[in-house]
Regions:
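Short acidic, glycine/proline-enriched helix-loop-strand junctions
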Residues: 225-235
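Core AdoMet radical
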Residues: 50-70, 74, 78-97, 112-125, ...
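Conserved C-terminal portion of the radical SAM core fold
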Residues: 166-225
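Acidic (Asp/Glu)-rich catalytic clusters
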Residues: 74-78, 103-111, 131-141, 173-177
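N-terminal [4Fe-4S]-dependent radical SAM core
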Residues: 1-84
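Short amphipathic alpha-helices and their capping/turn segments at secondary-structure boundaries
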Residues: 70-74, 125-139, 170, 199-209
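Active-site mouth loops of central-metabolism enzymes
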Residues: 35, 89-97, 189-196
């Protein structure tokens, strides 16, 4: 088998558990500050949550129902599987602390769930929320994943993120200080960014302190603002 030049997530996660684990996506009913009017109402120009949400993942169902349906789907292949509840849709720390506690702990109470993965924005965590997540981290497996998207503030403005890269660095620092496994997402090929710009950002992202990095290719989804921009002015 060819040895990869990096530590891929599959090999890494297998070393964390004595059993096979699978993430189950959950839509816990959150929104985003650039959707609900606090920062904007338009959302990120590239985003359509429906494109990465499994069929069992629906906010009209309870968190427990979504996880149980996800378990039924994956158990057909691996009956002895354990699970990580993946709070994936929208911004999963954008709510009151009590709301977060209720939702996270509902997921953790489901049989065979051994941890949670929290997808969020770097401008939607504070000391109180991070302290609570750090406490959870003492009791179960926790990953916090930040949507960084780019280290270029002009790009972040152009795609209507509503935060800066400096905000991402600060959130990563505070999360890491609490001993929480910290991940980040970036997108290659955002408007205005070519190969040289991606290579310029690589050491900047690398030095941010992340434990996990997910690299996505740019996808232009029909119906998004970015699709309209691309139709009018291809990049």
């Amino acid at each position: 088998m060819e040895t990869l030049p990096y530590n891929d997530f599959g090999n890494w996660i297998r070393k964390k558990f004595p059993f096979r684990v699978q993430k189950i996506s959950v839509d816990a009913g959150f929104t985003c500050p650039n959707r609900d009017g606090r920062l904007s109402v338009n959302g990120c120009t590239f985003c359509d949550n429906r494109t990465f949400s499994p069929s069992y993942c629906s906010r009209i169902k309870s968190i427990k129902e979504q996880i149980e349906e996800g378990k039924a789907f994956f158990a057909r292949k691996y009956p002895e599987m354990k699970y990580l509840a993946y709070f994936q849709s929208f911004t999963n720390t954008y709510g009151s602390l009590e709301d977060l506690k209720r939702k996270y702990e509902e997921a953790l109470a489901v049989d065979d769930v051994v941890g949670i993965v929290i997808g969020t924005r770097p401008d939607c965590v504070d000391e109180q929320k991070l302290d609570y997540i750090a406490k959870l981290n003492e009791e179960c497996f926790v990953i916090v994943e930040y949507g960084i998207e780019s280290a270029n503030n002009e790009t972040l403005r152009r795609i209507n993120r509503g935060h800066t890269f400096e905000c991402s660095k600060e959130a990563i620092k505070k999360t890491k200080e609490r001993g929480i496994i910290t991940g980040g997402h970036i997108i290659i090929g955002l408007p205005g960014e070519d190969q040289n710009e991606s290579l310029r950002q690589a050491p900047i992202i690398s030095e941010s302190g992340l434990d996990i990095l997910k690299i996505h290719q740019m996808q232009i989804i029909k119906g998004t603002k970015l699709a309209k921009e691309y139709t009018e002015n291809p990049f």
